[in-house]
Amino acid sequence: MARSHGERLKTRHKFNKDLRARGLSPVSKAVQEFEVGQKVHIDIDPSVHKGMPYRRFQGLTGEILGQAGRAWFVGISDGGKKKTVIARSQHLKPQKNSA
């Protein structure tokens, strides 16, 4: 049988939740708002399939560039090249201030 090359290929451990975090996400993650220029971490929530960024961007930190509907544009640097990732707010976590 031919091997599949789907979006979630090689994500068996990367998209695992710890035992206490299993199940659906809280609604507060779905309705969180960001400001343009705010720093966010891409933290993919595997229980929400809509608006999920590609697995390569898991764990990266970027800057909010704008919004389109329920999704956010996040500017990241991938190997020195600027890229724009489109993700819903369930897959984004605001960066805490280092002050």
Curated annotation (Swiss-Prot):
Protein name: Large ribosomal subunit protein eL21
One GO biological process term: translation
Gene: rpl21e
Transmembrane portions of the chain: none
Classification via Pfam families: Ribosomal_L21e
Lineage: superkingdom: Archaea
PANTHER family: 60S RIBOSOMAL PROTEIN L21 (PTHR20981)
MF terms in GO: structural constituent of ribosome
Gene Ontology CC entries for this record: ribonucleoprotein complex; ribosome
Source organism per UniProt: Methanocella arvoryzae (strain DSM 22066 / NBRC 105507 / MRE50)
Family listed: Belongs to the eukaryotic ribosomal protein eL21 family.
Alphabetic keyword roster: Ribonucleoprotein, Ribosomal protein
